[in-house]
């Protein structure tokens, strides 16, 4: 099961995204933040361990770009993806430069985000021993 952290300031989007991901993917959202400050506080806590961080770029306070930069500086192993309404070529390039593995457009790439999460879940599940059937 993927342990995820969500950085999203819209309560409606956050609620719908959590419900969708937890229904369709073996994933549990451990927490969320609606601002850069609260995201960094959560991520800075050594007891908060996650496999995936989903980041919106425009937050109630601060920027998702700064959250990505922080994750890059700390060397956290979690996969980082961006979910934004502003997925231009330039924004995608900047996010990838800050360590995002993928950038998804909220308006048309939710299915691609789900597929990405399913691939992560498949990669993180232990392989069955030789001769064992699934």
Regions found by a protein language model. Name each.
Residues 90, 108-118:
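C-terminal output helix
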Residues 35, 63-66:
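Acidic catalytic/metal-coordinating carboxylates
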Residues 11-31:
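Two-component/phosphorelay signaling modules centered on CheY-like receiver
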Residues 8:
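Conserved acidic carboxylate
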Residues 60, 88:
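The feature encodes the CheY-like receiver
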Residues 56-57, 84:
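Active-site residues of response regulator receiver
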Residues 32-52:
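Acidic, metal-coordinating helix/loop segments flanking the phosphotransfer/catalytic sites
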Residues 65-76:
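Short amphipathic alpha-helix used as the core "switch/output" element in two-component signaling
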């Amino acid at each position: 099961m993927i342990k995820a952290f969500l950085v999203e300031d819209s309560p409606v989007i956050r609620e719908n995204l959590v419900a969708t991901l937890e229904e369709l993917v073996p994933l549990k959202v451990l927490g969320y933040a609606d601002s850069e400050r609260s995201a960094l506080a959560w991520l800075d806590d050594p007891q908060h361990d996650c496999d995936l961080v989903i980041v919106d770029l425009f937050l109630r306070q601060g920027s998702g770009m700064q959250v990505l930069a922080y994750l890059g500086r700390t060397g956290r192993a979690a996969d980082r993806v961006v979910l934004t309404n502003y997925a231009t070529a330039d924004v995608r390039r900047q996010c990838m430069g800050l360590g995002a593995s993928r950038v998804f457009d909220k308006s048309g790439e939710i299915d691609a985000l789900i597929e990405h999460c399913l691939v992560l879940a498949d990669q993180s599940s232990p392989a069955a021993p030789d001769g064992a059937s699934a």
